[in-house]
Curated annotation (Swiss-Prot):
PROSITE patterns given in the database record: MYB_LIKE
Originating organism: Arabidopsis thaliana (Mouse-ear cress)
Upper lineage: Eukaryota, Viridiplantae, Streptophyta, Embryophyta, Tracheophyta
Function: Probable transcription factor that binds specific DNA sequence.
Entry protein name: Trihelix transcription factor GT-2
Gene: GT-2
Keyword Transcription: yes
GO cellular component: nucleus
Gene Ontology molecular function: DNA binding; DNA-binding transcription factor activity
Length: 575
């Protein structure tokens, strides 16, 4: 197909259209259409440049048998103009444009003539220039004709010469000059040139509006060329249209593909972003949910701990109340069983002949009478707790019953106190007696309490005031007065105990006082404060008791001992 087009274009003459090419070049320069693109589509300026270069090299194409170097030259010139196209692309583009031009001229596109193809005028001029061949210089006779201005409706039909130059030479030329008016030939509408609005059929002008051109003779070869051209045009019109439609379809498909891929990637990107946002939101919600669960678990654990502590506290209070109720019931039962007041110990005769017998009898009598005293004093003590509710078993103050028990035990041991020697074992024995009665007091505390109540007794006695029985200041005045009166009446000093009895008693007492050593060490700190506060509260007994309570750091507790028989006492004494 391209070979037929090249043969047709190479067989056409072309050397007389210089002025037309110059006008076309000027027109393209005035429009300002320049650099092309390197894509598949050929812009209009680039196509015009290709047609101009091809028309300039038309003579070279007709004279040369090798067309490839010529197309390389066209590609180079296109490169100089700024259009990067290969020789193959230039050749294909020119063939396609020429094919479509032929189809347009035949009127098979279904559109009005002159408006169907944008390069119609350029290709028509190129075809017109190619249809004339200059006459050889060696030919003496020239056939010329003076062409006059024809009406605007008339058109010039260029004759395409045969491809064989010898046929032209053999034809008989017209040897005379004459004026002719060329009428349009309708037998071959393919070669009808589009006429401008002027009356001149060609763009060739002279000074007198007449042009002398060579008129070739009409021969049979002309009809053959016309028929071959018609066949070429009909065979290539369909391929040109298909190529153009294919190019247009490719452009549309490429655009659709780009649009499709662009939309696809945009959609994928949006989906990815949405998924990431959902994952981030889910992650934050999970963290918040876990934090709330942790806080709720901590709150629940805290509530459980508080409930457990409250239950333990209530259980402890209940157990203590039950224990207190049991102790009160036991004490009341013992009080009912014991009956009256404990008997006072009998007075001992302090005779030298009865000293040893007195010691043993005194021990047995004291121990035998102590259980009853324990029951009575304990009952009185617990009754005082129930009535007043002011003194608890863990208080450090000396209740009245405890002080009375101290005075009673001290009175029972008055004979031993009058003896010469150290008084430490005596107070240890008093402390042991207090412990048997249920009062946990050390020997040192018992001694200090005894000295304090005696000091108050002396001060009250020196005031020479008559004390009533229910006096609140020094309520033990009458008991102490009876003790001192009895001491004054007896007058005789008791003899010291045998030496063999003292170590045994000291051994018994040392076992009982061993556990009280640490308590005495803690109580040394408040000893000095006891004396200072005790002196400032001389008038009122309540103040004196409060001062002693602040100084005393030890606690007392109720100890319910079972009744000991005299035999047990003797066994403990001599072990």
């Amino acid at each position: 197909m391209s070979g037929n087009s090249e043969g047709l274009l190479e067989s056409s003459g072309g050397g007389v259209g210089g002025s037309v090419e110059e006008e076309k070049d000027m027109k393209m320069e005035e429009t300002g259409e320049g650099a092309g693109s390197g894509g598949n589509r050929w812009p209009r300026p680039e196509t015009l440049a290709l047609l101009r270069i091809r028309s300039e090299m038309d003579k070279a194409f007709r004279d040369s048998t090798l067309k490839a170097p010529l197309w390389e030259e066209i590609s180079r010139k296109m490169m100089e103009l700024g259009y990067k196209r290969s020789s193959k692309k230039c050749k294909e583009k020119f063939e396609n444009v020429y094919k479509y031009h032929k189809r347009t001229k035949e009127g098979r596109t279904g559109k009005s003539e002159g408006k169907t193809y944008r390069f119609f005028e350029e290709l028509e001029a190129f075809e017109t220039l190619s249809s004339y061949q200059p006459e050889p210089e060696s030919q003496p006779a020239k056939s010329s004709a003076v062409i006059t201005n024809a009406p605007a409706t008339s058109s010039l039909i260029p004759w395409i010469s045969s491809s064989n130059p010898s046929t032209e030479k053999s034809s008989s030329p017209l040897k005379h000059h004459h004026q002719v008016s060329v009428q349009p030939i309708t037998t071959n509408p393919t070669f009808l040139a589009k006429q401008p609005s002027s009356t001149t059929p060609f763009p060739f002008y002279s000074s007198n509006n007449t042009t002398t051109v060579s008129q070739p003779p009409i021969s049979n070869d002309l009809m053959n060329n016309v028929s071959s051209l018609n066949l070429f045009s009909s065979s290539t019109s369909s391929s040109t249209a298909s190529d153009e439609e294919e190019d247009h379809h490719q452009v549309k498909s490429s655009r659709k593909k780009r649009k499709y891929w662009k939309g696809l990637f945009t959609k994928l990107t949006k989906e990815l972003m949405e998924k990431q946002e959902k994952m981030q939101k889910r992650f934050l919600e999970t963290l918040e949910y876990r934090e709330k669960e942790r806080i709720s678990r901590e709150e629940a654990w805290r509530v459980q701990e508080i409930g457990r502590i409250n239950r333990e506290h209530e259980t402890l209070i209940h157990e203590r109340s039950n224990a207190a109720a049991k102790d009160a019931a036991i004490i009341s039962f013992l009080h009912k069983i014991s009956g009256g007041q404990p008997q006072q110990p009998q007075q001992h005769n302090h005779k030298p002949s009865q000293r040893k017998q007195y010691q043993s009898d005194h021990s047995i009598t004291f121990e035998s009478k102590e259980p009853r005293a324990v029951l009575l004093d304990t009952t009185i003590k617990m009754g005082n707790y129930d009535n007043n509710h002011s003194v608890s078993p863990s208080s450090s103050r000396w209740p009245k019953t405890e002080v009375e028990a101290l005075i009673r035990i001290r009175k029972n041991l008055e004979a031993n106190y009058q003896e010469n020697g150290t008084k430490g074992p005596l107070w240890e024995e008093i402390s042991a007696g207090m412990r048997r009665l249920g009062y946990n007091r050390s020997a040192k505390r018992c001694k200090e309490k005894w000295e304090n109540i005696n000091k108050y007794f002396k001060k009250v006695k020196e005031s020479n005031k008559k004390r009533p029985l229910d006096s609140k200041t020094c309520p033990y005045f009458h008991q102490l007065e009876a003790l001192y009166n009895e001491r004054n009446k007896s007058g005789a000093m008791p003899l010291p105990l045998p030496l063999m009895v003292t170590p045994q008693r000291q051994l018994l007492l040392s076992q009982e006082t061993q556990t009280e050593f640490e308590t005495d060490q803690r109580e040394k700190v408040g000893d000095k404060e006891d004396e200072e506060e005790g002196e400032s509260e001389e008038d009122e007994y309540d103040e004196e008791e409060e001062g002693e309570g602040d100084n005393e750091t030890s606690e007392f507790e109720i100890v319910l001992n079972k009744t000991s028989s005299p035999m047990d006492i003797n066994n403990n004494l001599f072990t």
